[in-house]
Amino acid sequence: MSILSERQKDDLNKSIAEYLYAQDLTEIADSLCARLSLDYKSEPNSKYAGLLEKKWVSVIRLQKKLIESENRYTALQEDIAAGPARRRDAQVDWLPTAPARYTLTSHRAPITRVAFHPTFSLLASASEDTTVKIWDWETGSFERTLKGHTREVWGVDFDSKGSFLATCSSDLSIKVWDTQQWDNAGYSGKTLRGHEHTVSTVKFLPGDDLIASASRDKTIRIWEVATTFCIRTITGHEDWVRMTVPSTDGTLLGSCSSDNTARVWDPTSGVMKMEFRGHGHIVEVIAFAPLASYAAIRELAGLKAATKAPGAYIATGSRDKTVKIWDVHSGQELRTVSGHNDWIRGLVFHPSGKHLLSASDDKTIRVWELSTGRCMXVVEAHSHFITCLAWGPPVSAVARVELPRTPFCGDPKPIASRIMEEFNPRP
């Protein structure tokens, strides 16, 4: 008994007949049609033209993915059998090393930002080629391209569930993409407009109902995802706002600017809570310290009073080649660490709370021990400027991006960096 429905059998028979006609095997095709009582005539625009070949290629591709999945499953089973407790400890303290596992190539211009999906093995990359590309970091394969922006894309961020992806661009717009509609032809997401210059960063706030954006128009804006309305404009910076990030509970919003300052705001009122001055050049990047790092920071600064309030400490990186750690509530500079030889473009706290990682245009990633401020390791993994870092979800893969136009993926933990082309002007 055939496992195919009548319609499936008819499609299969016609596809075979079309293939035979295309190979100039007319007599065999006619004989087949007669034997199967098949009423079919080959036509140039027939929907069956090339269908058999496409199905064959799809089967081969699926077989390859199945084999890769089986191999990964076998490797994971062996790793689990080798000692899960020991591996968990190793994962907590893992630090990035060269070389990367994958080189992902497809973008036609410098890559500007990368973001990990919170659940699936997906990596989004934004580029000056006006597109966002989605990759499977586990296999190193390209998934799809998102088109909709008309100029350089500078920021990309997933919400906490991975249901939406936000992007921002020099075309003055922010776009919110429903991940369930990626495959729909012509889909270009919802557009949020209001900024008057390049939008440099976009971030979902905790709860995923609001988005914060930073712009060269010197403002930070808060947007409702559902309505696409701008509900608040925060002003105060005197120059380009390079980045904005929320605290883990969403009660604070940090920003850094070309005016050489970093600031912390109340996102519900737009009131500035603290200003941080001390850098001698543009402040490129800001990051809130996670609760896991508080003990190490207190040891670093000699602080006795303990706090568990989210957003108690921040780190900033500047074109003055230094990283500074600050007490948010007092505004006190706790420590300055130096070692990079060029602009600092990326900062990320290690999930264990023991380290802070920085990326620089000097082509290195440095690992700093938070409790002492000492540089523990220098990763010389790139040949061009490194301009951002992102740490992905637990039990994930490492992704770094090196340009021209190539992201790298490694193992076994998620960290992402991107590098601008050597000849690309530094804004």
From Swiss-Prot:
Main localisation: cytoplasm
Entry's Gene Ontology cellular component terms: cytoplasm; microtubule; microtubule associated complex; spindle pole
Positions of WD repeats: 106-147, 149-187, 194-233, 236-275, 278-336, 339-378, 381-420
Keywords noted in UniProt: Cell cycle, Cell division, Coiled coil, Cytoplasm, Cytoskeleton, Microtubule, Mitosis, Repeat, Transport, WD repeat
Limits of the LisH domain: 8-40
Subcellular locations according to the entry: Cytoplasm, Cytoskeleton; Cytoplasm, Cytoskeleton, Spindle pole
Recorded GO MF terms: dynein complex binding
Residues in coiled coil: 58-82
SUPFAM superfamilies named in the record: Lissencephaly-1 protein (Lis-1, PAF-AH alpha) N-terminal domain (SSF109925), WD40 repeat-like (SSF50978)
GO biological process: cell division; establishment of mitotic spindle orientation; microtubule sliding
One Pfam family, short name: WD40
Family, as annotated: Belongs to the WD repeat LIS1/nudF family.
Domain notes from UniProt: Dimerization mediated by the LisH domain may be required to activate dynein.
Cited function: Positively regulates the activity of the minus-end directed microtubule motor protein dynein. May enhance dynein-mediated microtubule sliding by targeting dynein to the microtubule plus end. Required for nuclear migration during vegetative growth as well as development. Required for retrograde early endosome (EE) transport from the hyphal tip. Required for localization of dynein to the mitotic spindle poles. Recruits additional proteins to the dynein complex at SPBs.
Subunit structure: Self-associates. Interacts with NDL1 and dynein.
Record protein name field: Nuclear distribution protein PAC1-2
